């Protein structure tokens, strides 16, 4: 292989520019697992976490008296990644049409999760042996056949591999979770990645949270650049859907937090029952250890397929106790046909050169362990042992997402080889060109246009013809058989047109050992009907207080941000969760108050008619004649009209009644007061006319009284005419004065005109009171001055009391106040002026004579 050039100084600079760990290239060097063939694919896998001193072994937590700073774990289930590659290569070799009867081999190394060991493994693939000699091909029979490399499992491992392979332009396919950072590193060749539509993943998580109404959640991400991007994107998506975080923590894969900080971190995990974790198994490995150490349980963990928690080597039920009931999202994978059968057939004697199967078998079947780093004794293992017999906590027969990526990566390389070899065959019919493996860099054009694309700042779709993306949702639950498994409970479909569909069978979901029902994950209890949310200062928007809706507003849903104002013609019920139609209110004839007022008005009107009839019958009696019969008739008729006009105030207000009732009231009352004023004036003028030498005649006094009545009434008519011509009364509604009622009332239009009418009546009444008061001592048996004085006092008292009562009342009460004022003042005039005369007419009419009258 003549790929190696004079890049040794550059290789050394790149590999050692960061002090990752004190690791020597020769420390525990492995020869790798090699299978010869015409073309060889390199594989760099991670089967063990060694971050320092032993903390946790396969049986669980070893020492619970303190928290170690380092962790150790054999990830036995990650051996499935290697088997997926072996299975894919064997399957390809069985099909002569893919590689034109050429075979495909592999060269595999375990780099754990150590970045320097990943660099060593990369150089071992280029050098042909381990420990490697940088920039030198020790085994050209191996290195000349290398066409591509698959690895690593994380971003940091992939970067170290890429730093070496990119110098020699060897294609690298990373099976790590998609990371935009891999495409932005300053290096010659970025690794190829399997695309992952993170927008679909975040949308799926959000829709799941909304489905269960989980709006108060925690978020845990790895403390690296990828975690920063996760945190930024998923936070933005969740906040836009009304979901907020109880906490957002970053977890380092190295020991950078002391015990106090870890205790504080564990306390924060108890703030909410639902925790979202976005990251891979290795980057979040430490949090698993501390959750078990602090015995934190009862949380619902929402994860992605990258955090394949069942791969961790713990004793039976230990993982399920703390993480059971969790939900995980995985991009839909087609089942690899024949892979489970292949796993059942895997045995050490079938693959005697597999250096990894020995450790796996000894762990799964209880064989003697590694002896002095050299010897293995598998004689005590089950001779016919099968991986399918192992429980879930030890081995998983289901294809993991990582295994699926490795399998797909092998086929992507095989497809690229097929296309490259096809070009050779077209140019050379003798097939001599197929004798040598193609140079690795020649596969780049085919990998770029195939299912895998170069990683850039934008994610590449695996299949550009398929716009819809489907995610499977799994629930980690315990089966009736006593084993634990990931059970598919739903799926989420997302396409480029933003069409989303979440289907979930929540009836088969279990929530672990500590919960029997769906957990409630909210910061504040839901605000019931009739209450709205108000923010709590210093807390996220999901934390709120519930306050009752103000008057006139309702909340007909739970957790309303603002109450809804009822329409003007409706009002809220007592619970303030529904708007009810307001009741139309006016002083109706059927109302008890309306009935009483109607009866009173009719009775008083009839009573005034009876007095009028009495006066007509006894019109020739001295007392009737002495008090000016015509004015008495006019006054009684006007009072009867006053009683009758009050009936127009009762009933639903209409345009005609609103206009006529105040106008008629004003004019009729002006006639009444003018007639009383004329009567008072006659009393005074009569005594002056009978004095010796007076120029006044009784006929002149009578004509003058008629003029007073006409003049007083005409002025009121003019005031009413101006009122009607400018701003007349009209029917109106009052929706706000009384709760739950719409008051139908007559708006007086011009308030000034209304009070001018009342003021003019007050002026006439005051003038009558003044004249009557001055004439009260005139010597006459039929002198009306005293009764008029008393009647005017009653009249003025009623209407003076009317003004404040009228202004302070609303609706039916306001109308009733005016009706009572009309009836009371009219009844006062009727009683004070005419009842004494009726008494005289009916009981003492015989004792009066004209002679006595003139005395």
Curated annotation (Swiss-Prot):
Chief place of localization: membrane
PROSITE patterns, sorted: G_PROTEIN_RECEP_F3_3, G_PROTEIN_RECEP_F3_4
Mode of membrane association: Multi-pass membrane protein
Matching Gene3D superfamilies: 3.40.50.2300, GPCR, family 3, nine cysteines domain (2.10.50.30)
S-adenosyl-L-methionine in keyword set: no
InterPro entries for the chain: ANF_lig-bd_rcpt, GPCR_3, GPCR_3_9-Cys_dom, GPCR_3_9-Cys_sf, GPCR_3_C, GPCR_3_Ca_sens_rcpt-rel, GPCR_3_CS, GPCR_3_vmron_rcpt_2
Tissues where this protein is expressed: Expressed in the basal epithelium of the vomeronasal organ. Located to vomeronasal sensory neurons that project their axons to six to ten glomeruli that reside in globally conserved areas within the caudal accessory olfactory bulb (AOB).
Name of the protein in question: Vomeronasal type-2 receptor 26
Membrane topology (Cytoplasmic): 617-630, 684-706, 775-786, 836-855
UniProt gene name: Vmn2r26
Top-level division of the source organism's lineage: Eukaryota
Subcellular location: Cell membrane
Pfam families per UniProt: 7tm_3, ANF_receptor, NCD3G
Keyword Transferase tagged: no
CDD domains: 7tmC_V2R_pheromone, PBP1_pheromone_receptor
GO CC list: plasma membrane
Family listed: Belongs to the G-protein coupled receptor 3 family.
Signal peptide coordinates: 1-22
Membrane side Extracellular: residue ranges: 23-595, 652-662, 728-753, 808-814
Gene Ontology biological process terms in this record: neuron differentiation; response to pheromone
Membrane-traversing stretches: 596-616, 631-651, 663-683, 707-727, 754-774, 787-807, 815-835
